Amino acid sequence: MSQARTLHRLIAPAVEALGFELVGCELFRRGATTILQVFVDKPGGIGLDECAKVSRQISAVLDVEDPIRGRYTLEVSSPGLERPLYTANHYRRFIGNKAKIRLREPREGQRQFRGMIVAVDNEEQVTLQLDNKILKVSLGEIEKANLITDFEG
């Protein structure tokens, strides 16, 4: 299990106890700094004060469990307009929206695709309508995905 997934399972109960959805979390390095980025949401959106409240709760859990080696920075925020997509339910929720996905392994010599989410089946296979074709990929093939904001219509 990846460290991000382990962290997700560790902090989810604390976030949900406050009445928020834990959209996802990512652990990465920015220069010499380790960053734990946590995305939280609720119907109607989440504000800065609520993010601070969640941050304090997560910090308390992480201080006790100490799952990250060394120093790190905790960033808690809303997922934003171009929110990341992690689960089949995220894709289902945004059927009809445009997304950008990056595959773990190239398909037809390409790893990045942009298209409209048109379906998600029970086997967690996501279907995207690209410009001129349909792309079907399993969640396990997707390295990273997020919604695309299209302001041009």
Curated annotation (Swiss-Prot):
Cellular component, GO annotation: cytosol
UniProt keyword list: Cytoplasm, Ribosome biogenesis
Record carries keyword Hydrolase: no
Organism superkingdom: Bacteria
Localization per Swiss-Prot or TrEMBL: Cytoplasm
SUPFAM superfamilies according to UniProt: YhbC-like, C-terminal domain, YhbC-like, N-terminal domain
GO process terms (BP): ribosomal small subunit assembly; translation
Entry-linked CDD domains: YlxS_C
Biological role stated in the UniProt entry: Required for maturation of 30S ribosomal subunits.
Xref: NCBIfam families: PRK00092.1-1 (NF000927)
Family: Belongs to the RimP family.
Name the UniProt record assigns to this protein: Ribosome maturation factor RimP
Protein's organism: Coxiella burnetii (strain CbuG_Q212) (Coxiella burnetii (strain Q212))
